[in-house]
């Protein structure tokens, strides 16, 4: 195992985010260094190289993030999760996002529009997710792998030359039967695994971050079908385009590659002294008689209701990926709680916890299905969705339509005027939330 270190300029951000001047990528080397496999014969032929890991936050304040990919990106699901998360859960970064999904696209296709569509807006950081169309829904062959490698490498080099940081995402996996392919799913997934391994080679060569979409999706999809039945489709009902659960797996891969820590703050209450404190973008307004009132500029990630057995449920994907413990750690700690049990009311919900549990700390988003942030989070998320929908129209229909062919620069200027209020609506939707946590001893 070797470590390659990339020097970064010093950034001044909150201690919560642990922003450092050096971002290190732990890069696995050696042909024998592979990801562990589940103990099942279906994985026997797979040799997934050990994925590099990002250490330290790759994002910087005021970053301009480009999220790039094919029709899976154009679904505007994982891209929406990412933008909403970065806006709501890491508000101090003030990251802005553009979504560039294009159905049917390969890495070569984006390479050819990279300058006109993306680099003109001077992104400071970018993520890509290609390989699904590049693998051509057939078994792997070396010539196609080399074609993929050359185009992926050209994209990485193009963004690096423009001064942008980069996250190279692997393709995902396919499900049991792709309707438009006669190749078996095993052959296609072995092909996609090879393209994933090529992406790792490029990430190591170019010293950029890597987002492993393929291996978690393949292994967690297998786990989910064992738990919920064969109808659970991590790769989507058409075996290619994931529903919300699979999209959460994708978003999780990119959050990990971006070096997101997931600590969203802690509320600490001392019942013995009657004092309370809060960290991470939360302010104590009052604490009396066991009732803590807070004002929060940082939101937890709030998912709509959904069954864990539903592959089109965000909550299902969050459970599969341990999302709450990894990226949604908003905690309540109660000290000097002598009673055996306590009722905790947060927003519309009330739960009972032991004094020991409260002393150790509880993860609020994991324990409360409904939160005081839900309505504000939904408004913000809807604003993100509206903007991303327009970005698809802006690029596909206008930049590459009659308007763009007639006068590209005028089209850019006019569409940017239309996009500006949609981007502003996201910022306006992010408002502080005042909420209470009530702690009562159970007699």
Feature annotation, model-predicted:
Residues 7, 54, 58-59, 80-96, ...:
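Alpha-helical cap/lid subdomain in secreted, periplasmic
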Residues 32-61:
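N-terminal pre-domain segments of enzymes
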Residues 16-28:
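Bacterial N-terminal signal peptides
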Residues 1-15:
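N-terminal secretory signal peptides that target proteins for export/translocation
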Residues 62-77, 103-106:
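Catalytic nucleophile-elbow at a beta strand-turn-alpha helix junction centered on a G-D-S/GDSL motif
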Residues 5-7, 29, 35:
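Short linear motifs centered on Gly/Pro in flexible linkers and helix caps
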């Amino acid at each position: 195992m070797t470590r390659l270190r990339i020097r970064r300029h010093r950034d001044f951000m909150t201690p919560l985010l642990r922003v450092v001047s050096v971002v290190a990528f732990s890069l696995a080397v050696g042909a024998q260094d592979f990801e562990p496999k589940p103990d099942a014969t279906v994985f026997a032929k797979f040799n997934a190289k050990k994925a590099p890991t990002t250490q330290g936050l790759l994002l910087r304040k005021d970053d301009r993030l480009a999220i790039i990919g094919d029709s899976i990106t154009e679904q505007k699901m994982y891209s929406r999760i990412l933008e909403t998360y970065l806006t709501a859960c890491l508000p101090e970064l003030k990251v802005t996002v553009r979504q560039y999904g294009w159905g049917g696209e390969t890495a070569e296709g984006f390479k050819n529009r990279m300058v006109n569509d993306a680099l003109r807006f001077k992104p400071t950081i970018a993520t890509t997710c290609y390989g699904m169309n590049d693998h051509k829904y057939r078994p792997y062959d070396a010539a196609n792998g080399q074609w993929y490698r050359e185009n992926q490498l050209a994209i990485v080099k193009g963004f690096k030359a423009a001064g942008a940081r980069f996250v190279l995402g692997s393709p995902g996996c396919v499900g049991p039967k792709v309707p438009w392919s006669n190749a078996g799913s095993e052959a296609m997934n072995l092909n996609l695994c090879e393209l994933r391994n090529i992406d790792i080679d490029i990430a190591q060569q170019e010293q950029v971050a890597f987002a492993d979409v393929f291996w978690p999706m393949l292994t967690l999809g297998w786990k989910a079908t064992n738990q919920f039945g064969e109808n659970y489709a991590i790769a989507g009902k058409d075996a290619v385009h994931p529903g919300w659960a699979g999209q959460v797996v994708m978003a999780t891969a990119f959050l990990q590659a971006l070096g997101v820590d997931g600590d969203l703050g802690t509320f600490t209450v001392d019942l013995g002294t009657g004092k309370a404190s809060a960290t991470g973008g939360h302010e104590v307004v009052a604490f009396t008689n066991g009732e803590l009132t807070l004002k929060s500029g940082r939101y937890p990630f709030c998912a709509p209701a959904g069954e864990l057995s539903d592959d089109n449920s965000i909550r299902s994907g969050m459970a599969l990926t341990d999302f709450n413990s990894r990226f949604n750690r908003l905690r309540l700690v109660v000290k000097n709680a002598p009673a055996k049990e306590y009722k905790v009311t947060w927003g519309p919900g009330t739960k009972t916890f032991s004094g020991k549990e409260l002393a150790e700390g509880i993860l609020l988003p994991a324990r409360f299905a409904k939160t005081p942030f839900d309505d504000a989070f939904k408004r913000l998320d809807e604003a993100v969705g509206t903007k991303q929908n327009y970005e698809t129209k802006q690029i596909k229909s206008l930049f590459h339509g009659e308007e763009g062919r007639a006068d590209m620069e005028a089209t850019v200027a006019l569409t940017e005027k239309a996009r500006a209020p949609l981007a502003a609506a996201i910022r306006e939707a992010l408002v502080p939330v005042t909420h209470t946590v009530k702690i009562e001893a159970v007699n």
